[in-house]
Amino acid sequence: MASEEAKFAARADRLAGRQGVAGFMPASARAAQPAPTNRYIMPQFVEKTPYGMKTQDAYSRLFEDRIIFLGVQVDDASADDVMAQLLVLESQDPNRDVMMYINSPGGSMTAMTAIYDTMQYIKPDVQTVCLGQAASAAAILLASGTKGKRLMLPNARVLIHQPAIDQGFGKATEIEIQAKEMLRMREWLEETLAKHTGQDVEKIRRDIEVDTFLTAPEAKEYGIVDEVLEHRQ
């Protein structure tokens, strides 16, 4: 009997490994799993095309309309996704605008600069639209859209602040290297925001010394966006 139970347990563990079903996992494995979230499950829908029926999700449908949705933290993975989409859309039609919707808490400075450089590199104009929030690194991406094509919804907000060091420990020489790199990144951020907003570098320097939150009208006045829209035009 014990051997049968052992066989069943082993089979259940193998099945859990294949399916990733928490209920099939041993207690030790379940304890190691992240807590469940209430994330909304993105539905898929079926659309009729000249080539037959096609099933896709909302993000794929938006991409067909040349819309990129940045709705997560800015990190290496999301940066790669955004850059790949920008390059594909340029190759499909270099003369049509790309639209980037942003609702992001920010994230990695290096990942953000990779997206920024790609936005400046490609030929199509990049329209940026802030829904919800564009914080930290995401605020730079919002401001770096094509001038005159940077939009924001009325209840969205922007946060700008200075970059921070991921690690503040190590050998003295390593800390010195990190500090120099942080100062270099801060100088780049100040100059880039000044370039895209028209603000004086000294004002940018003062404003990012602490967390500075901007409402949609304030972001427009600051020069981060060009228009605040309540309805699609």
Swiss-Prot record:
Signal peptide: none annotated. This is ATP-dependent Clp protease proteolytic subunit 1. Belongs to the peptidase S14 family. GO terms for biological process: protein quality control for misfolded or incompletely synthesized proteins. Cleaves peptides in various proteins in a process that requires ATP hydrolysis. Has a chymotrypsin-like activity. Plays a major role in the degradation of misfolded proteins. It holds the Pfam family CLP_protease. It is an enzyme of class 3 (hydrolase). Disulfide bonds: none annotated. Transmembrane segments: none annotated. Gene3D superfamilies: 2-enoyl-CoA Hydratase, Chain A, domain 1 (3.90.226.10). It comes from Bifidobacterium longum (strain NCC 2705). Fourteen ClpP subunits assemble into 2 heptameric rings which stack back to back to give a disk-like structure with a central cavity, resembling the structure of eukaryotic proteasomes. Its EC number is 3.4.21.92. Keywords: Cytoplasm, Hydrolase, Protease, Serine protease. The keyword Hydrolase applies. PANTHER family: ATP-DEPENDENT CLP PROTEASE PROTEOLYTIC SUBUNIT, ATP-DEPENDENT CLP PROTEASE PROTEOLYTIC SUBUNIT-LIKE-RELATED.
